[in-house]
């Protein structure tokens, strides 16, 4: 977008005036990249907790993939052009629901057509004065014409309200639903058709790149840096000239490069060497790919029998392209404290030999760990020389030439062409015994080829089952596995040895994805290991469970404790009170225009007579005026002419249906809040033996650090359980609609007009009251939920229990004091992270609430002081 480019340019421009020389040097170092950092395999310490566990970010929810302006635009289009978006409505709702919405849409079009065809009949007519009439008669005729004009204008406004209000309700429902489903932007096609479409796009993309590659003036060079640790090996390699290395006899067979239609992310697992096969020690190769360079860091594990063979295989790629090797290594990022590093260059169309075939064998006890990674390609977003410092993670070129070359495959041991898959970021680690990265040796060509054949068939059929891979990691990683990144969504693990994380933590201002990406890479980096490892003994605590009258002990995990609360809530009966309240409100709001029309017919145009008539006598007067006929009463309610009756009747039906849908949506939000409150209520019962027994829940005390961690995990999980963002959207929509209605009422009441009690003002008032009742319910439940999860009283009670245990068991004083200190820290952390309940982003500020209370009470005391004759004072109003 042009505006985006202008803002980015100006931001970069003004940033140059604040920079000093040291900052420019640091930024240049960042852009160059820190490629000399050694990477080692490690294991995350999942037994520790983060602040996200208390805040609730450990169990994240889906986030919208579209901006607010995009959602509003799509909501308008989906309502105005509803038949064209039939597939979307059917997918997001049901066919029956879409049919019902389509009928309402067609009735609205019919209503507008009838109104447009007959709208000329309700235009006020011009009354001419009689030529020979008196002045008094002319004034009387003028008054009559003014009254008729006012009557016609009121009828015109009533007809317009019957047309515009259903349209506004339909647009509001479309906007709410479009914002709810903004997290799901996938098209309505099936998985197979999307993959076929991706293959077609990949083929066209490859042809375009081939055309641009032919016309390219300068070729990019890749640098292969081979690092050797052993001093004798480095000395031997440095004493041999490059021509001798090229003519040396190589015993490593270079596999032919597979032809791939498009460099796509693949999940690859290196082949496991057979422990029974005699192996030859060889250097371990770790490949690190950046945007400008590709480094192959080779660390010698033991003295090599044929060190020159591996070097010859690496330099064979330069001989293949007809290019010469550099005479001296590149001097950037040189560390003189490290062994001698040998460099080799190769052109773009070539592939380093170490990426084709890696000569590495590990000891039998180190066999079993596999590293599978997917590295996506991103669109070029910056110009030449610009980078964000993350090129080593996301594979994005810092020189802006990603579209001009084909990046090297990321596979370590690739012997068969992988099928194109959807772009995503995923790293899967499958551990069995120990943790080293292994790959096939040169002597194990047959097992590797068998594994590649099986992986190729798996990739082509797209029927690889994730459950099989996860259940048998040792056998699953004996072959190269290529699968779609979206297939890993929803994978649950039962052990600590099987987990997956993302390569890059994506934020809101992160990099843009390619056009082939369907899933957000940031969503794969947020898997809660606390819930997904229920069988780990470290995450289980001792709980008390009541079997009728007997108390029994059991070791339960976070997931099992939370599931007990969820099952208990699900077993409770759902109250339908607010559903019925919404139905009543729908009929009430629909009958308001009819009620106002009947009141106008009954009272007539005489204002003095209308002020004298009591509203309790109106039903009797209306029945007398209709001559005790129901059809006459309906005629008075829906107009005189046939087309007016049609417009008002269709508007009545539309308003009833749409209002009912809207209040059902509000009832869904109320039920979700009630469910959250029940979760919070039962969560507070866990540490109380009496309440836990009454609620049939497990019971445990916070006398151990492990118990405190489990308690915090259950609290965080239950707070994120169920619909979150969608319900917040509904509540925010109700709040904003109420604000708009109150603003309209304020403007109407500020007018000095006799038309203060029109049906529009009355309808806006009733709408504000009905939606305000639901908002009051939301605020009440939200405050109760916050109070239950605050749990300060629970923590204080557990501290008292710890002191009681110290008195009873002095030998365990140190352990109990540690738990007491952790409880105090947990209480302080909960107070620090506590936020009040927010309604549409606006929190219930206690200071603002107290200020308003003081102002209202002060005004009330002033009025009462004047009425009663003595002064009233306000006492003990404190701001908490």
Swiss-Prot record:
Start and end residues of each stretch annotated as Disordered: 256-286, 357-412, 434-464
TM segment ranges: 68-88, 97-117, 156-176, 575-595, 646-666, 727-747, 756-776, 848-868
Low complexity: compositionally biased ranges: 265-274
Modified residues (Phosphoserine): 517
Glycosylation sites: 132, 239, 431, 452
Compositionally biased tracts (Polar residues): 394-407, 449-459
Keyword entries, A-Z: Glycoprotein, Membrane, Phosphoprotein, Transmembrane, Transmembrane helix
The protein's name: Protein phtf
């Amino acid at each position: 977008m042009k505006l985006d480019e202008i803002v980015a340019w100006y931001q970069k421009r003004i940033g140059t005036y604040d920079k000093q020389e040291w900052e420019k040097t640091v930024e240049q170092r960042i852009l160059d990249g820190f490629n000399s950092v050694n990477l080692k395999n490690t294991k995350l310490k999942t037994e520790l907790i983060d602040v996200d566990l208390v805040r609730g970010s450990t169990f994240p929810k889906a986030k919208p993939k579209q901006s607010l302006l995009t959602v509003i635009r799509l909501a308008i289009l989906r309502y105005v052009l509803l038949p064209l978006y039939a597939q979307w409505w059917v997918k997001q709702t049901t066919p029956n629901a879409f049919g019902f919405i389509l009928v309402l849409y067609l009735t609205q079009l019919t209503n507008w057509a009838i109104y447009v065809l007959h709208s000329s009949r309700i235009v006020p007519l011009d009354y001419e004065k009689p030529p020979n009439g008196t002045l008094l008669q002319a004034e009387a005729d003028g008054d009559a014409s003014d009254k008729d004009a006012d009557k016609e204008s009121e009828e015109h406004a009533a007809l317009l309200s019957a047309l515009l209000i259903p349209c506004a309700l339909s647009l509001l429902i479309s906007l709410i639903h479009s914002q709810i489903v903004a997290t799901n932007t996938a098209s309505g096609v099936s998985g197979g058709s999307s993959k076929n479409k991706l293959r077609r796009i990949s083929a066209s993309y490859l042809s375009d790149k081939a055309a641009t590659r032919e016309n390219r003036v300068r070729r990019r060079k890749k640098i292969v840096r081979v690092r050797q640790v052993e001093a004798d090996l480095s000395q031997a390699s440095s004493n041999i000239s490059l021509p001798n290395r090229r003519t040396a006899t190589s015993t490593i067979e270079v596999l032919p490069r597979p032809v791939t239609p498009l460099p796509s992310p693949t999940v690859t697992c290196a082949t496991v060497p057979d422990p029974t096969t005699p192996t030859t020690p060889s250097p371990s190769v770790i490949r690190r790919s950046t945007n400008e360079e590709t480094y192959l860091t080779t660390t010698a594990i033991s003295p090599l029998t044929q060190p020159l063979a591996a070097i010859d295989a690496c330099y064979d790629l330069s001989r293949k392209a007809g290019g010469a090797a550099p005479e001296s290594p590149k001097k950037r990022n040189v560390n003189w404290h490290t062994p001698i590093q040998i460099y080799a260059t190769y052109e773009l169309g070539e592939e380093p030999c170490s990426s084709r075939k890696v000569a590495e064998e590990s000891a039998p006890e180190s066999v079993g760990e596999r590293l599978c990674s997917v590295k996506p390609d991103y669109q070029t977003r910056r110009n030449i020389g610009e980078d964000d410092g993350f090129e080593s993670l996301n594979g994005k070129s810092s020189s802006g030439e990603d579209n001009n070359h084909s990046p090297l495959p990321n596979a370590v041991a690739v012997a068969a062409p992988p099928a194109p898959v959807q772009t995503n970021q995923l790293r899967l680690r499958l551990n069995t015994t120990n943790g080293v990265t292994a790959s096939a040796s040169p002597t194990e060509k047959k097992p590797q080829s068998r594994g590649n054949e099986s992986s190729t068939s798996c990739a082509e059929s797209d029927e690889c089952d994730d459950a099989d891979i996860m259940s048998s990691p040792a056998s699953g990683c004996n072959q190269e596995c290529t699968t779609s990144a979206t297939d890993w969504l929803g994978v649950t693990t039962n052990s600590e040895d099987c987990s997956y994380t993302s390569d890059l933590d994506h934020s809101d201002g992160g990099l843009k994805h390619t056009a082939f990406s369907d899933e957000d890479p940031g969503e794969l980096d947020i898997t809660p290991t606390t819930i997904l490892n229920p069988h780990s003994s470290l995450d289980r605590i001792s709980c008390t469970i009541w079997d009728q009258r007997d108390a029994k002990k059991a070791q339960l995990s976070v997931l099992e404790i939370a599931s007990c609360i969820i099952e208990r809530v699900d077993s409770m009966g759902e109250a339908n009170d607010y559903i019925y309240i919404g139905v009543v409100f729908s009929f009430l709001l629909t009958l308001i225009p009819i009620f106002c029309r009947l009141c106008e017919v009954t009272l007539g145009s005489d204002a003095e007579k209308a002020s004298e008539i009591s509203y309790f006598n109106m039903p009797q007067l209306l029945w007398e005026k209709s001559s005790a006929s129901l059809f006459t009463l309906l005629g008075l309610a829906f107009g005189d002419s046939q087309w007016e009756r049609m417009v008002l009747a269709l508007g009545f039906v539309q308003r009833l249906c749409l209002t009912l849908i809207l209040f059902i949506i509000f009832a869904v939000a109320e039920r979700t809040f009630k469910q959250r409150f029940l979760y919070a209520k039962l969560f507070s019962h866990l540490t109380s033996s009496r309440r836990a027994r009454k609620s049939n829940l497990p019971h445990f005390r916070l006398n151990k650090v492990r118990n405190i961690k489990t308690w915090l995990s259950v609290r965080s999980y239950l707070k994120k359980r169920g619909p979150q963002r969608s319900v917040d959207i509904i509540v925010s929509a109700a709040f904003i609609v109420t604000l708009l209605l109150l603003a309209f009422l304020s403007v109407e009441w500020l007018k000095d007009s006799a038309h203060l009690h029109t049906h529009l003002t009355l309808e806006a008032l009733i709408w504000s009251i009905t939606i305000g009742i639901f908002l009051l319910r939301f605020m009440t439940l939200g405050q109760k939920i916050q109070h239950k999860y605050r749990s300060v009283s629970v923590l204080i009670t557990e501290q008292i229990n710890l002191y009681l245990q110290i008195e009873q068991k002095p030998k365990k004083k140190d352990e109990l004091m540690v738990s007491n200190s952790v409880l105090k820290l947990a209480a302080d952390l909960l107070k620090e992270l506590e936020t009040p309940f927010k309604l549409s982003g606006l929190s219930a500020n206690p200071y603002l609430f107290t200020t308003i209370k003081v102002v209202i009470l002060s005004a009330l005391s002033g009025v009462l002081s004047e009425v009663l004759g003595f002064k009233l004072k306000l006492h003990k109003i404190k701001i908490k």
